Amino acid sequence: MLRTAKRVFPAAGNRNGSNVNNVQNNGNYWSATENNSNNANNLNFNSNEANMNNNNRNNGQSVRLVQHLSYDETLLTDLFRAYYDARKNKRNTKSQLRFELNLESNLISLYHQLRKRKYKPSPSICFVIEDSVKREVFASEFRDRVVHHLYWNYVAGLFERLFVYDSYSCRKGKGTLKGIERLEHHIRSVTHNFTRSAYILQLDIQGYFMHIRRSVLKEIVLEVLHRYGYTDPLLLYLTDVIIDKDPLKNCRYCGRLTDWDGLPDSKCLSKQPSGVGLPIGDLTSQLFSNIFLNKLDRFIVYQLGFKHYGRYVDDFWLIDESKEKLQDAIAKISSFLSSIGMTLHPKKIRLHPCTDKISFLGAVCSPWHRHTSKRTTQKFKNKLLLMESNCSKEKIDDSARKNISACINSYLGYLGHFSADTYVCKMLVDSILLEHFSIHKTSNARYGKVKMLKDSLK
């Protein structure tokens, strides 16, 4: 869609009191700006007659044309904005530092490549992470991350308005904690604060990212863009380039070959057919994952009639008073997913009463209580052990001390939303980190903030 922005042209017509003509009669907008000639206000809104307002001031108001600007015409400014978005939390990475060494020339080069439609994404970097679950990640070069943020800034606002309220991944103000809170809200709503019986159906899509058909995804994205008038050539070009990129082409593998041992085929992009799978690690992949399943969200809410529904990426749930209605929904949802090349995970179909313990997004929810899952507490324990091994009993520098303090505070801030006091406090009390830090309880935090001891700074 063409955006309205102020682009100043020569004054529209004669400004000395005569008629002002808009010859093209094209319905452009107009803007009044100060002009140093002794003249009057001349206004023209698609007519041949000037609307004159005599003015005794030396500086009259001259009406100038304001024209719709295309994305190409604001591209350089948009690229600088995208760069600053992309570098958040990435200031110390090698690819970001390399890009910043010649920042202006790199952005201008990228600008010309995009204007001439000659931009080609760089090869991705592939590696395996094992953060509770083994995953294959494809990381893009920082240059491509800038383009991803550029595309995000252009289209995310449109798709955000189309998503259902209860989808939580990669949306502002709708992270994991919001997803947990909304699950509890829906349970209390259906059960009338646990005074009535209700059931929850939990489902999971098997190997979601690795089974997304890029051709189907592009059809969905382009259909929405055209429907709402987002037909700028640059925007359509970026859609093609980003979705059509083959992450496996000339990618660089990092790590040991043994890192891929035990990785299921459903989580490995190289085991998928050509044109299938999105790279985990790109910002655009998070956006596309929400777009791809938006039709599923609407199918469940509006066609199957489930008001109490929520989804985080490929993990979703439905709540209803009728157990039979939920059982019937399994086959209908499975059929819908088959039409877009997806399948339900056969081992992750769970239908049980809302009074049972419900695991979702690292939390275990039960009536009137919210606990952390074993996986979440184990991650905190592992992180604590890692920091202890780095600290040992030796003196640590200010930079490391600040990083450790920030990491612990982040975990404590998150765990403060759960009933995990005894476990967390025991781990902290027994930790050798207390030789470098002290815990100061604040009035608005369950565990307080970790602060440096004064004597540890000597």
Predicted regions and their residues:
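Short Gly/Ser/Thr- and Asp/Glu-enriched loop/turn motifs at secondary-structure junctions
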Residues: 122-124, 310-314, 346-347
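C-terminal, surface-exposed recognition/capping segments
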Residues: 2-70
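Conserved two-metal-ion catalytic palm core of "right-hand" nucleic acid polymerases
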Residues: 70-226, 230-235, 247-250, 457-458
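Conserved polymerase palm-domain catalytic core
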Residues: 106, 186, 191-313, 318-332, ...
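A common structural junction motif
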Residues: 334-342
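Beta-rich nucleic-acid/ligand-interaction surfaces
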Residues: 170-178, 317-320, 351-355
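Right-hand nucleic-acid polymerase module
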Residues: 140, 145, 149, 259-275, ...
